[in-house]
Amino acid sequence: ISCSLVGSEMCIRDRHHIHFASPPYTSLRAKLKVRDLARELVEYTGNCTLFVVPYTKPQEYIRDNAPDVLFTVLMRRSMLRIANQVAKKLELQALITGESIGQVASQTMQSLAVTNEVCELPVMRPLIAFDKQDIVDISLKIGTYETSVLPYEDCCTIFVAKHPVTKPNLNVIKCSERHLDDVIDEMMERAVSTAETIEVC
């Protein structure tokens, strides 16, 4: 299952995409933008399925109950857990993300290693060594650039930590997650069970 549409084009057989929606912080237009991007990839992937996961409750809970500097890493770990659960339900064998080294604080080697630790399935990162211009060039080539730059918010641009940790310690992260207790697990399970399925063709 793919968490990245450009990354999906690099792994051409992928036909399942996941989008994390956090209304009211993210709008219907943001969801439709992702649907439109998936449509633009149909030429390469064939018909595909988009899973829209309601992520507001887990995201708010992490924001309100974890240290601000750890918010980004904790959020991304929870997103990978959810993607892992969706993929396992569909009997898929891997996750695909669009991360590239050093583009943002959550994509340092240390952050990626700590994020990866929660995932049972392999995580493929076809854009890992690409810089921003490389990724822009790919999106221009496959015809998704104009849609991708539409200025609609996504769940990764809300509740942004002022000074996110760039070299997270796994033990510290796990300690913070224990303080989130079973509530966050229940929220993630509900997010998976109530995900909206959109067939894209």
Language-model regions, residue ranges each:
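Single conserved hydrophobic/aromatic residue that forms the stacking wall/gate
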Residues: I1-I12
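Extended, hydrophobic alpha-helical segments in both membrane/secreted and soluble proteins
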Residues: S2-S4, H17, V34, I135
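Peripheral terminal appendages
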Residues: E9, C48, L92, T108, ...
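Cysteine-dependent PTP/DSP-like catalytic domain, specifically the C-terminal lobe
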Residues: R13-K57
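Short hydrophobic alpha-helical runs that function as membrane-insertion/retention elements
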Residues: R15-I18, M124-R125, S148
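Short secondary-structure boundary segments
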Residues: S22, G98-E99, S148-P151
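Active-site adenylate/phosphate-handling loop in enzymes that bind or generate adenylated species
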Residues: L41, Y55, Q59-D137, K141-I142, ...
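A glycine-rich phosphate-binding loop feature that marks nucleotide/adenosyl-phosphate handling sites
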Residues: V53-P58, S100-I101, E153-K162
